[in-house]
Design a protein with these regions (language model features):
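A feature for loop-to-transmembrane-helix boundaries and adjacent hydrophobic helices
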Residues: 1-259
Length: 259
């Protein structure tokens, strides 16, 4: 939409600005909530940096997995860092890296998992605004009043009205964040806020995928993200009921409920 803002010799890429804003907002939210609830600030910082590294690696690794057939035809795709970042890969990579970090620090993972997930959803909302500015993750053509038209996008078709899937996703992410914060205020068992995120995000992402029209890989009639969404929902349901037993397994830190 308006991804590049040129000020003299400086070009500001709004996609990058939104990603950075999302990371910063997520960190500040987590630090603020963690401080109120007595969480170790150093651990939060550690999780934040590990999640960024794991998340960035995850986005690329899942992209490579999805694009194996194309990579076999053109190996140079491996070195194309301008494109190819899969959100679900970032979520999986960030969670895995954070888990490993908590294990090395002998901290219970579930309480911190709960603490950060509302902020993760908030950051995703910013990221989807970045997608809107760049024109990626675009929707199907529509004649509806809410359709948007891109004119200078390197990703979306220009000059035709499209369903604003990026804005729909952003709204969904912010709503999920609000719901998770409300749920966390009820002091549920450790692990259940994160479980709720997996279920809510999985359902929302599965639905939005039907509205998208960008190429993103498929498994049969479902997109790769829809298949992962099904796994996320199932995993979230299992985690919700297993959370009381899993919260302190293999950790020495005291279990906490995030409020």
């Amino acid at each position: 939409m308006f991804n590049d803002i040129v000020i003299g010799p400086i070009t500001i890429h709004m996609y990058g600005v939104m990603i950075a804003a999302g990371f910063l907002a997520a960190l500040l939210m987590t630090l603020r909530r963690g401080k109120k609830r007595g969480y170790d600030e150093d651990i939060i910082w550690g999780i934040f940096f590990c999640a960024i590294i794991g998340g960035m690696l995850g986005t690329r690794i899942l992209y490579y997995i999805v694009e194996i057939p194309e990579i076999m035809k053109d190996p140079f795709i491996l070195w194309d860092f301008k494109n190819g970042y899969v959100v679900y890969g970032g979520i999986i990579g960030g969670i895995l890296a954070s888990y490993i970090y908590c294990r090395t620090k002998k901290q219970a993972f579930m309480p911190y998992f709960d603490l950060v997930m509302p902020a993760v959803s908030f950051a995703q909302g910013f990221g989807r605004f970045g997608c809107f500015f760049a024109g990626c993750c675009y929707g199907r053509e529509t004649d509806a009043w809410y359709g948007i038209t891109f004119h200078n996008s390197s990703f979306a078709p220009n000059g035709v009205k499209l369903i604003p899937t990026q804005l729909i996703s952003a709204a969904g992410d912010f709503i999920i964040c609000a719901l998770l914060l409300w749920f966390a205020s009820k002091r549920p068992k450790a692990g259940r806020v994160a479980a709720a995120y997996l279920v809510l995000y999985g359902i929302g992402r599965f639905a939005v995928e039907f509205l998208r029209n960008d190429y993103r890989g498929s498994v049969g009639v479902l997109s790769t993200s829809q298949l992962i969404s099904i796994g996320a929902v199932i995993g979230g349901i299992v985690l919700y009921f297993a959370a009381p037993k899993l919260a302190g397994v293999g950790n020495v830190a005291e279990e906490k409920s995030v409020g």
